[in-house]
Amino acid sequence: LHCHWRTPGFEYKEDIETGSRAAAAGGYTFVNLMPNTKPVCSSAAQAMMVEQKAAEMGLCDVNQTVSITENFDGVSIDHLKTLPAGVKFITEDGHGVQDNATMAKAFAICTQKDITVMSHAEDMEISPWDYRLAEDIETVRNCWLSEYYQTKLHMCHVSTRGALDAIQMAKLRGAPVTCEVTPHHLWFTNDTCDYRVNPPIRTADDVQALIDAIR
């Protein structure tokens, strides 16, 4: 659900051929690509171009996501209103949408169009001084929006007990929320690993909560 092939614009990091071959070698038959390309994938036309090139490779099925806000500008969502039925997911990839009204309007549009919102939860005003609160507070907001609008929401790389609790409570209230966790957030703790990722490596308590949720 969460891959970065970087076509167009950043092919020196990964391109459609290398990504397709890696997916096939790992046994993956479907991959979902993030829109952090250059230009940012903010249209169905650009998404279809990437998907067509991947289809020509013929090694795996590909879906190209579209950005929540146009060019990741944080506010413009008019492009969402014209997305065709083939678009399945929107995401701001490694950014949280900071403006509450913008995100609420995006959720409302996605409910009408049956599009799933994929969310990197990070309040950028808070993250400079508290990464944990930054993830937790935006997870709570997005779960409430999912419940209110009944918008399908997928929370990316959940890493804290608080965020997980918010997701579980939202699901109990009937919100259509799913989530994922990365291997490194299940394996490492911040007292044994000085490795910089976003979201950060968390505490042993967070790791145990994530493992328990999988079980």
Give residue spans per PLM region.
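Glycine-/small-residue-rich active-site loops that bind phosphorylated ligands and cofactors
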Residues: 11, 38-42, 71, 97-98, ...
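Metal-associated gating/positioning segment near the N- to mid-region
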Residues: 1-57
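Histidine/acidic residue-rich metal-binding segments in metalloenzymes
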Residues: 77-215
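Short, composition-biased local secondary-structure segments
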Residues: 45-58, 71-81, 135-140
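Short beta-strand segments at enzyme active-site cores
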Residues: 30-34, 63, 118-120, 154-155
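Alpha-helix-loop-beta-strand connector modules within alpha/beta enzyme cores
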Residues: 44-65, 108-119
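Structured loop/turn residues at beta-strand edges in well-structured enzyme cores
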Residues: 26, 60, 85
